[in-house]
A protein has these predicted regions:
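Short Gly/Ser/Thr- and Asp/Glu-enriched loop/turn motifs at secondary-structure junctions
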Residues: 56-58, 228-231, 261
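Active-site-proximal segment of RNA-dependent polymerases
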Residues: 2, 85, 89-146
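Reverse-transcriptase-like RNA-dependent polymerase core
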Residues: 47-69, 171-187
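Conserved pre-motif C helix in the palm subdomain of viral-like polymerases
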Residues: 70-100, 192-220
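Right-hand nucleic-acid polymerase module
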Residues: 82, 86, 192, 260, ...
């Protein structure tokens, strides 16, 4: 019997993309060179098909969250295991998109968050009640989902592939993995611990999306707006207790609960963060974490490089902001969405101050911050002691640089107009 999942995993183009992606993620190049060999890939294929392969126990690691001082525990596999898991995950998303509810927006290739954010903003703009909704977070979602829920997903996939229960080799590999609770702790000791969905294992992305399909379906049908990104949800409704009750009634079946510390009631006249943006009514701007990321990226291409020439700094900034990889860039991912003009101008002001500092070599220019207590903007400019002098010593306009507002107007007019301006840089 043909196994379309296994066959899809070993398509040549998929392996080419995998090796390129794995290199960017820092997987050992020696392992990648081995995987370029047809005989190695054939051996992996046969081992999976004949059920003669198991993944090694993962290693616990901690990565920082957006909140300073908070860390998330993830489970990192061996290099070869990570590559195979990535292949499986990509194929599951491609073969079974119907298992992910349309209101779940996480981890899916080509699914931008901009459309969702703009849809939410439109609804907020027409909501007149003081309380507009609830933002909620699952308590340790990846760690606590019960094993039965995970096994049920593997059963459904197996049935969709046309196999009798416990006969499809890829699902059997995953069953062995999730039934084995051996992991290496942070000190390198081999311990036994239930790990839930196992964030860090690529297949955990698919599981995180599909396991709560029941919740997504119920909430999206009952409420004006509902969206979930992994363990973060937002629901537009003026009765928070009703929303919370509905969610708890469903998620408890899967061993999941809401984190009471992260249930946030949303008010009409207050900013809140969602999917990397700050929203209030019809206003959309960048979240605090994205503002800090923007600052770091611009600084890394300008004032953080010793002896950089103004021309090189300009080229690097234009490449990051506008050119990107030829199709996507910072501008194309952000500017069609945000609409707070003062914040756009503040970002642009910071970029120009960085470029001026590369000419004067005076680099104490301050940075960017984000607050939620302003009526019509959130991004603040902290000016350093060299800013005024740098502006006085340089031209008001920077030759070869087009402002962020200018490029935003071009994008909103027509993508071809934007592309023409980029080609002229």
């Amino acid at each position: 019997m043909q196994n379309k999942l296994l066959e899809k995993m070993f398509e040549m183009s998929r392996w080419e993309n995998l090796i390129e992606k794995a290199d960017l993620k820092g997987i050992d190049k020696g392992v990648l060179r081995q995987m370029c060999k047809p005989e190695v890939r054939l051996a992996i294929y046969q081992a999976i098909k004949n059920e003669q392969i198991e993944f090694m126990p993962s290693h616990m690691a901690q990565i920082p969250k957006d909140t300073p001082g908070e860390y998330r525990t993830v489970f990192v596999g061996e290099n070869v295991d990570r590559c195979i898991q990535s292949l499986i995950n990509d194929c599951l998303f491609e073969l079974f998109p119907e298992m992910v509810h349309p209101s779940c927006k996480s981890y899916q290739v080509g699914l931008g968050t901009g459309k969702t954010v703009k849809e939410l903003s439109t609804i907020l703009a027409h909501t007149t009640t003081e309380i507009v909704g609830v933002k909620s977070d699952f308590h340790h979602y990846f760690d606590v989902v019960n094993l039965d829920a995970i096994m049920a997903v593997f059963d459904v996939i197996e049935e969709k592939l046309g196999f009798a229960k416990c006969t499809e080799p890829v699902m059997n590999l995953l069953r062995k993995t999730w039934n084995n609770n051996l992991v290496f702790d942070l000190d390198g000791n081999l311990i036994e611990q239930y790990c839930g969905i196992r964030q860090g294992n690529a297949i955990g992305s698919f599981l995180a999306d599909v396991i709560l399909y029941e919740l997504d379906d119920f909430m999206s049908k009952k409420y004006k707006f509902y969206c979930r990104y992994s363990d973060d949800c937002i629901t537009i409704h003026n009765n928070p207790d009703e929303v919370i009750c509905d969610m708890n009634n469903i998620i408890c079946k899967y061993g999941v609960s809401l984190n009471p510390k992260k249930v946030q009631i949303l008010y009409r006249n207050e900013w809140f963060k969602f999917l990397g943006f700050n929203l209030k009514g019809n206003q959309i701007t960048l979240s605090k974490s994205r503002v800090k990321s923007f600052q770091k990226e611009v600084e890394a291409r300008t004032i953080k490089q010793r002896n950089i020439t103004p021309r090189r700094a300009l080229n690097q900034v234009n490449s990051y902001l506008y050119k990107g990889d030829g199709q996507y860039s910072w501008a194309t991912s952000v500017l069609p969405i945000i609409n707070v003009e003062k914040d756009v101008d503040t970002l642009n002001e910071f970029v120009m101050d960085c470029l001026r500092a590369c000419s004067t070599k005076k680099t104490k220019i301050g940075g960017l911050g984000s607050v939620n207590d302003k009526e019509d903007y959130t991004i603040l400019r902290g000016t350093g002691k060299n800013v005024t002098a740098n502006r006085n010593k340089t031209d008001k306009e920077i030759d070869g640089y087009l402002s962020i507002r200018c490029m935003q107007n071009a994008l909103l007019t027509r993508r071809a107009v934007y592309d023409t301006l980029v080609r002229c840089m």
